[in-house]
Amino acid sequence: MKRSRKFSSSTTTTTVIHTFYNDHTTPPATKEIPIETPLPATKANVKTNATAAAARIQSGYRSYRIRNLYKKISSINREANRVQSIIQRQETVDAIRSDEKERLRMNETLMALLLKLDSVPGLDPTIREARRKVSRKIVGMQEILDSISETKDEIQWWNYNDLGGVDSGQGGGAWPLYWEEAVEEEMCRERGGEEMERFCAQYLGFRCFQRFLRE
């Protein structure tokens, strides 16, 4: 019978720490961070950009206001055209002649339009010119109303020669002339020169302009 032997082995690990001392002193490393100073030209560019931006904003706001003001003038002009079409009717002329309140009512309507025009600031030459043009139209209609009222008993409104007059046994009360023709004759007699030429061409039509040239 054999004997068996068991051998056991053990391993020992030793850790040796070596510390090295550096006798030479190493200076700490430094890192330089450059600081850039803006040049004066850069500051000028920033200021210029801000000024340009402000100018664009002001220009946009001005254009916005001008558009709104022009729309307001256009609205007043449309209303003036409507009143003008009413005044051109023969029944309106008859009402103005027979009723003083009707003339006052029409005058108040025209004055209200003039007040609306006065409330429009003249920020731009285009706005001022448009406002002036509509104002002249309204003032011209006021003059027509006054002429209708003031000349209701004068010969240009009755034309007795064409009717036969009182001597022929016919009373008044007829309207041989339309209001446009009567007003045109009145205006052509009162005014003259280039001013009347422009007024006739712009407001009273081609017939008045022809009459003005004949005279």
Curated annotation (Swiss-Prot):
Q: Where in the cell is it found?
A: Mitochondrion
Q: What does the record note about the induction of this protein?
A: By calcium.
The UniProt keyword set, sorted, is: Calmodulin-binding, Chaperone, Mitochondrion, Transit peptide
Superkingdom of origin: Eukaryota
GO MF: calmodulin binding; protein-folding chaperone binding
Presequence positions on this chain: 1-14
- Which GO CC annotations does the UniProt entry carry? mitochondrion
Key word Mitochondrion present in the record? yes
- Keyword flag Chaperone: yes
Domain description from the entry?
IQ domain mediates interaction with calmodulin.
Q: What does this protein do?
A: Co-chaperone that regulates diverse cellular pathways, such as programmed cell death and stress responses.
Question: Could you describe the subunit structure of this protein?
Answer: Binds to the ATPase domain of HSP70/HSC70 chaperones. Interacts with HSP70-1.
Q: What is this protein called?
A: BAG family molecular chaperone regulator 5, mitochondrial
| Source organism (scientific name) | Arabidopsis thaliana (Mouse-ear cress)
